[in-house]
C-alpha cells in the first residue's frame, strides 16, 4: 500500500538502517530549516536592532513558544501514530477518516491558541519578569507570532500525516521554500521597513502560511486514502478519542519540559540583560540539536507505528536498536562540534564582549552532556508508536520535571549563577534516561507483548 509516494522507503520490509536513514534525512534537514527561522530572526535582530531585541526573542518568548507549540506537536503525534498504524495494517477507510479528523482538529486548536496567545502575552511575560528593556519587544514579538498559529498548526499536522505514511521528502521541499521566504521577509521587514521585533515575527508567520498552503495543496491532490477533501472535514469521534489518548500525554510531557524551562528562564532573567542575551544565543545553538533529536524520534515512532499495525514486534526491536545508534552518534558529533566552534558561533550573534564571554562559558558547561539524552528520545518514541503514551509521560514527569523543579528551588535560586542553572539539564537528562532504560528492559512496554527477559 504505497499511496503517499512510490519512491518512499518501505517501513515494513527490507534493511532497517538504510530505510530509517532514507526516511530520517529529509526530516532532519526540514527540522533544521525550521530552526533556521528562529536563528535568522536572532541574527538579524541582534545585528540590526541590538542585544535587547535579541534577548527578547530568544529568552522568555522562546520559552513560551516552545511550551505552546510543543504541546500541539505532542498532541499531533497521536494523530500521526493512529494514521501510521492503520496505514501499516492496510485499512484505507480508517486512514481517510483519521486524516480529515486531524486536519480539522489542527484548525480548531490553532484558532484557540491564536486567541489565547494574543490576549495573554502581556500578563504571562510580566509574570516571568524579563529585563525591563526587553519587555515591550517580547510582547510585540509574541503577539505577532501567535497571530500565525493556525497555519503553523495546519502545516505541522499535514507534514506529520505525510511522514506517517512514509513520505518525508515533500515536507522538506516545502520548508526549503519557506526558509528562503523567511530570510527575505526578515530582511525586508527588519532592515527595510525598520519594524524591529514585530517585523521578525511577521516574517515567521507569513512563512508558516506558505508552508501550510503547500501542505494543504499537496494533500488535496495526493492519490489514495490520504487525499484531503473539504467535504469530508469532520470529526470521527472514535478516532479523535484515540488520537487524544495517545497525543495528550505526549503533549503534557512536552509542556512539563517547557514549564520547567520557563521557570529556568525566570532565574536567567534575574541575572540581567547580558546573561539573558548569552543564554538566548546558547538556546539558538542548542536549538540545532533538538530538531535532529526529534527527527530521530519521529523516524522511530513512524517505523514503530506501521510495524505495530502490521504486527511485527521483532522488527520493532531492531528499529529501537538502530535508533539508539543513530541518536548516540549524532549526539557525540554535535557535542564535539559545539565545543570546538564555541567562539566562532557566539560571535555570529553579537560583538558585545560581556555577552560573548558568558555565552562561551555556558557552552563549556553543557556541550558534552547531549549523549546522556539518547534513551529518553528513542524509547519514548517507540513506546508512543505502539500506542503506549502514558508511561513515557509519567517517567518524564518524575525524571525531568519534578527533579528539575527540585534542583531549581534547592540549588539554583538559593545560589543563583550560570553554573547552578546549567546543572539542571544533565542531571535530569541522566535520571530520565535511567528510568526509561529500566522500564524498557524489565516491564511490559509494548501493548500485547511480553516484557524483555
Regions found by a protein language model. Name each.
Residues 22-41, 144, 155, 178, ...:
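Transmembrane helical elements of multi-pass membrane transporters/channels
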Residues 1-24, 83-148, 184, 192-248, ...:
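Short alpha-helical transmembrane segments in multi-pass integral membrane proteins
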